Amino acid sequence: MVDETKGSQANILCKSCGLCCTGHLFVWAKLRSSELDSARMLGLNVFGSDPSQRGFSQPCPLWDGQCTIYTSPQYPHFCRTYKCKLLKEVIDESTSLPAALTVIQQAKEMIHDMESLLPNSPNPNFRERLVLELEALQNSDEQDDTNLEFRQKADALLLFYEKVFDVKDLVSKPDEE
């Protein structure tokens, strides 16, 4: 059980971060079968023909600088229960809230740098665009300074994701707790 102070610190961290909502950490989020209809009514892009991959795509359209349904009964179970490594550290007090907020700011700055290097695309999901660009560079014979800079920044961001959020690779499924 999270006490009230830890809970409010967790809320502050989550609401100021949102990387699990914006498509920067995940391509999609899981839904329970009982949540499919309400998620569709909320305007989420739901997919569910395969029970092992039932969910909605990211970025979440209900993220508007912070979650717009955070206190709603329709708030999906996965969203309510997901805890990244950094959040767990704030809850167990091994990382202070101010330090965690600084880390989130670092992540957002790294993402902003990567966004500027990604080609324009109609796809709103950062993670998918990053995967596509890395695959294109891997299959390309061109090895210029721009490609090298992109790969170095992408590698640094992915290592940061792993160390800070415990998101280990580009195509990992969101874990359900």
Question: Where are the model-predicted features located?
Answer:
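Hydrophobic scaffolds flanking metal-cofactor catalytic centers in soluble metalloenzymes
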Residues: M1-E177
